[in-house]
Curated annotation (Swiss-Prot):
EC number: 6.1.1.4
GO molecular function: aminoacyl-tRNA deacylase activity; ATP binding; leucine-tRNA ligase activity
HAMAP family, A to Z: Leu_tRNA_synth_B
Main location: cytoplasm
Residues involved in ATP binding: K615
Alphabetized CDD domains for the sequence: Anticodon_Ia_Leu_BEm (cd07958), LeuRS_core (cd00812)
Keyword annotations from UniProtKB, A to Z: Aminoacyl-tRNA synthetase, ATP-binding, Cytoplasm, Ligase, Nucleotide-binding, Protein biosynthesis
Assigned GO CC terms: cytosol
Gene designation per UniProt: leuS
Entry protein name: Leucine--tRNA ligase
Amino acid sequence: MSARFNHLKADAHWQGVWESQGTFQARDDSPKPKSYVLEMFPYPSGRIHMGHVRNYTMGDVLARYRRMKGFEVLHPMGWDAFGMPAENAAMEKKVHPGDWTRANIAAMRDQLKRIGFALDWSRELATCEPDYYGQEQALFLDLYAAGLVYRKESAVNWDPVDMTVLANEQVIDGRGWRSGALVERRKLNQWFLKITDFADDLLDGLDTLDQWPEKVRTMQENWIGKSQGMRFTFVLDAPAGDLTSFDVFTTRPDTMFGASFAAIAADHPIAQALSAGNPALQAFIADCKRTGTAAAEIETAEKKGYDTGLSVVHPLDPDWKLPLFVANFVLMDYGTGAVFGCPAHDQRDLDFARKYALPVKRVVAPSPEEAAAPIGDEAYVGPGRIVNSAFLDGLSVEEAKAAVIARAEAGGWGQGTTVWRLRDWGVSRQRYWGTPIPIIHCEGCGAVPVPHDQLPVVLPEDVAFDIPGNPLDRHPTWKHVDCPSCGKPARRETDTLDTFVDSSWYFIRFASQPSDKPFDRAVAESWMPVGQYIGGVEHAILHLLYARFWTRALERIGRIGVKEPFTGLFTQGMVTHETYKDPAGQWLSPEEVSDGIVVATGAPATVGRIEKMSKSKKNVVDPAPIVEQYGADAVRWFMLSDSPPERDLEWTESGIEGCWRFVNRLWRITDVSEAGDGEDRELDRKLHKAIAGIAADIEALGFNRAVAKIHELSNAIEKAAPSASRAAAARALVRLVAPMVPHLAEEAWARLGEQGLVADAAWPAHDPALLVDDEVTIAVQVNGKLRDTLTAPKGAPKDALERMALESEKITRLLEGAAPRKVIVVPDRLVNIVA
């Protein structure tokens, strides 16, 4: 037997066997119970990175384990293949986005196969192919027919570099998430999906997702943002054009007596009316438009206002007037596009009031005695009683809210209502490399759906990327078609769908891929929902919320009988690495540094923080040469070891070397040529505890704990004398490690003379009787202090334990021949000698 595991030979051989035999192809008609394991599919950038490897290794271990436990497992792979990077590559490298994307897919597919993932490649899909996006177009039209899709003019986040619209979630600190350009606010006709129709259901459904991380559920709850409050009317003291009043929504009607101003959005009808002939206000509104529509950006931007010179009448006191501002922090598409400001109890309002010298009046205090306590630099947002508020004085905050709403409803100037932070999903993107929206615009008929028998609407190949913007707008023929309704000349919609639409249903298409429809309902329902979904927490709002909405929308129109797409969700940590700089402050890759020295120059390198691997800081480790040098199993083992999977994992050279040594150690341990005879009850017990414990750890995604148990069992097997028990333990170990180091396991399984593949073998069964220890450790105390420990048979009688304790060498020496006054025995736990 070779003492060293030949990973190069084994990896290639067994990967070929699995592929040729279709080992991991899931059968829709299998009589076995079904299990659907899925990692978030990747964007085909061209290279697999270590974050991918960690993510897919976790899912792979679970998928392989569940196969061994008797499940028919669906574990597919595909490509989230539309998006801006392909268009950027087209502009920079003069290559068609489709060619660039498909070449990247081929490269990444090969890389994934070299790591030995148990994937069903027969179900591979790419969202950029017409057989996928054509079915997406069919679903879009179904939702359109159901009234869940509409088009309207809307203020949007416009990226002037990528020349496309961004969703609020894609604007980070006022900049486009891909280009980094400062985002502008514009009005464009956009297509929307009515996600707000499902707001209550999306919120309520979070309570059923008990296998999701609490932080993800909280993030979605906050994003949906259900607010109970009051909608009421402010009357202007003078008209703005023909407008004399406007509505306001507030979640704090209890603080109305603390109001010191009212504010409206820059695109509010009153602001627009007042701007006519007012260059100063026009300039202010233009400045506001240079701020994106994302709430997070507006929250952090400097608060600015324009005093209109008008006032509004306070609805609780007709003699009380509040100045009206146009403000850059008020959004037209949240609430009513208007607010009242209560500086004492809202930090944003307080900052604004201090800037514009507006009154600050406390109306909530921890106690009545603090009614006159001044407000400093921080607004008071804590609990308390209402003060300085006429008929509300002395009430709690909730009592005051109810009282104001009751008075408003009785007076006819307001009513209690609910609003949501969640906005309808704008899905129009002004770019080429995306799913064409299957709508035709006709001057006479309006927006006309493309007939289903004319799908897919395929992207034209002959496009140019020599200037920014959408090539579909400039195409000489593609957009010119006849109206399906009246036959007159018309034009295609040239916007394409947000790529998050593509990822909102791919998991259903994996389950069923007929050529004539998006999926077969019965087949899809036999797999759905996904039992375990694995991916990064950065998708908590965007992808995961959209996928939950899309599945609900399909359920509403009768396409599928599932509402929640993912039963279990696991968000893994990142893979990190040290960062390095040369003396000039330039980033260096790990390959450019050796023992703290810049390889090229011999100069000392600066070792920086351990951070997420990123191209910008060059601390990326390419998995391909690591797999070549150490083998796929060593890389997989590293990804599972040490750190809990939900935490970050630091990549180190010493760590992968240690994993490679352990893989070779496993190769030696699983050789049972020296079988031996007889039983080793202690080893039997350790084996069966390991079988049960590793299974429980994998089910709980506690891979690092499973790895620790395999180390313990391996140590026990190595130390044990040759015996039948040792041989059995070594054979069982092969199956226990098979989900984690599958190439070694297959090689060892074949060496043992076993039939078939270990991938198809059953998980070892454990004997519950062997999980119970036959022996226990007894603490021996003298006058309450621990002095010795004993090993005794479980259930030993009290007199036997007392005798063993008194005969202990340590205890005999301590007692110095004196008889104890009393001996207290707690069976299986403790002997306490009172001297």
